Amino acid sequence: MIVNKQTFSEISVPTYILEEEALRRNLTLISHVAKESGAEIILAFKAYALWKTFPIFRDYISSTTASSLNEARLGFEEFGAPTHTYSPAYLDSEIEAVARCSSHLTFNSLTQFERLHVAALSANSNLSIGLRVNPEYSEVGTELYNPCAPGSRFGVTSIKLPDVLPSAIEGFHCHCHCESGADVFERTLVHIEEKFSRWFPQLKWINFGGGHLMTRKGYDVLHLINIIKGFRMRYPHLKVILEPGSAFGWQTGPLVSQVVDVVEDRGIRTAILDVSFT
């Protein structure tokens, strides 16, 4: 990228610059994947929540995903549509407010479901309830960030599910990826089906979470489309949902900062910026 200093001359504090053309390019690709595959693709606020760009997003997608009450409010009040909401744990004092801002609400455990789903449905009778499941497989390399590592706090493993799900549970939510390719999704899907397909006839939808970095250069978009189409052919009654975050904002502009000092030690010169070193 060639930087024109004059472009940033009036910026005095660290600033992310969003390039609308680049953003729309990502949105166009994501919209294409959704149309061709038949999946619903929604925006994850965990990775992207620049609410002033929501009018642009509404030209391409219809919903968002939240992980807290404030994120659910952001989607409901600023994006203009109820959210798909998941949290590792909901507070009793917030569950009704979360439900009123949501179209889908996913519980992390059966105990949370049992304790709170009645209150959630009382607050919003149109709510679709889901359960996060853990296929015990993920190719995320760093254990700290692996949602399916042994002892993970995320989701219910197959051995803990009853043969017949509670009637209020309409969907499963899986999140196993981080900036992953379509090949990783394909391999992960084998494990998801192996562990959980016997419950699929009882469901209406399945959410394959985020981490699908489909806007990255070299990503096999056609392969992703074919994977989803193949899954939908095997389970035509299931609505498929993906909720990437980084894919929407991927390489849509620079972070502008300033060098405020240069230090040297043992021949190594280091520029000190007015942004985090990491």
State each model region's role.
Residues M1-L18:
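Generic N-terminal amphipathic, Lys/Arg-enriched alpha-helix
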Residues V3, R25-L29, K35, E40-Y48:
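N-terminal glycine-rich anion-binding loops that anchor highly charged ligand groups
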Residues N4, H32-V33, D92-E96:
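Short, flexible, solvent-exposed loop/turn segments with mixed acidic/basic and small polar residues
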Residues T7-I11, E170-H175, G209-G210:
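A short small-residue
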Residues V13, L18-E19, P147, V156-S158, ...:
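Generic structural "secondary-structure junction" signal
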Residues A22:
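Active-site anion-handling motifs in enzyme catalytic cores
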Residues A39-W205, I227-G230, R234:
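Active-site-proximal beta-alpha core segment in soluble small-molecule metabolic enzymes
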Residues S180-T278:
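C-terminal active-site-proximal or functional interface alpha/beta core segments in diverse enzymes
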